[in-house]
Structures are given as C-alpha cells and as structure tokens.
Design a protein with these regions (language model features):
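Eukaryote-skewed repeat-based solenoidal scaffolds used as protein-protein interaction platforms
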Residues: 1-125
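C-terminal accessory extensions appended to soluble enzyme cores
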Residues: 109-150
Length: 150
C-alpha cells in the first residue's frame, strides 16, 4: 500500500488521515484483485492506538528505516523507530517484513531488505533483481518482487 508517512511533528488528525489513506488505497486495490503488502508507519506512542489497525495478523508488511537513518543520524529517530517497530511486531506478528533501506541490527523478525535507492523512481528502468538496465513492464518487475518474498 502507498507510504503516507507519519512524522512526529504532524498534527494527530493528519497522522490519522494518513493511516486512513494508506488502508483505503490498500483495500480498494485488493478489491480489484491486486495483492497488497501494507506499509506500516507510526508516530509517537500515542499513534499506536490506531496506526496498526486494519492490518491482518501474520501478514507480510513493509517498513522503511530511511527517515530514521538518513537524516542527520539522530539517535532519537532510531529510538522512535525501534519503539514503533517492536510494537508492530507485538501487535501484527508479521510473517515477513520488507524493509526499505538498511535494517537496524536490533530489528528482529523475518526481514527482507530492499535497497532504498534502487527501488526509487530513478531506477524504474533498472531491474533490481538481476541488475540489468533494461526496461521491463511494471507488472513483470512486481511479479519478480513477489516471488522473492515468498
């Protein structure tokens, strides 16, 4: 599902709205037969009451360490990320966790790392699985990604 990020400084109503948009898009696409891997985001501990809602227990989920690791490497961001991550593990008990960017060593679970830069729009013509620089239809690339996580 799309990454509608939640930031610590966001107003609570905007955090709730971003969770709603994430789940709505995922539900809509699923109703059209598209396999959905929900992206999980959280803010501070007050968001834990709603940010994990609507995600099936034991499912495959996606998270990103990018904002917690690439911006001034602030320790507070890593602590915030790990608090939400551990709460996500407790509540959702995901089968697999697709992690965009480098996982932190403390992260537990069945983690499938994905290179953040190579998965960005800049590499839409770059096959992240084989390393080939040829254009492939998005559907074909997505099918290969699903095979990798199975």
């Amino acid at each position: 599902s799309p990454d509608f990020s939640m930031y610590l400084e966001m107003a609570p109503v905007m955090q709730l709205y971003n969770v709603f948009r994430n789940r709505w898009c995922g539900a809509y696409w699923a109703s059209k037969g598209i396999r959905i891997i929900p992206t999980v985001n959280w803010g501070n501990e007050f968001t834990f009451d709603f940010c994990f809602e609507g995600i099936e227990k034991g499912s495959v989920v996606a998270v990103s360490t990018y904002m917690a690791s690439e911006h001034d490497n602030r320790e507070a961001q890593k602590e915030w990320f790990m608090a939400g991550y551990n709460e996500m593990l407790r509540r959702i008990e995901p089968e697999k966790i697709i992690c965009y960017n480098t996982p932190f060593p403390e992260m537990q679970g069945n983690i499938v790392p994905v290179d953040y830069e190579r998965s960005s729009w800049r590499y839409m013509s770059y096959d992240v699985v084989s390393g080939e620089k040829i254009w492939k239809p998005l559907k074909q690339v997505a099918q290969r990604a699903v095979i990798m996580i199975q």
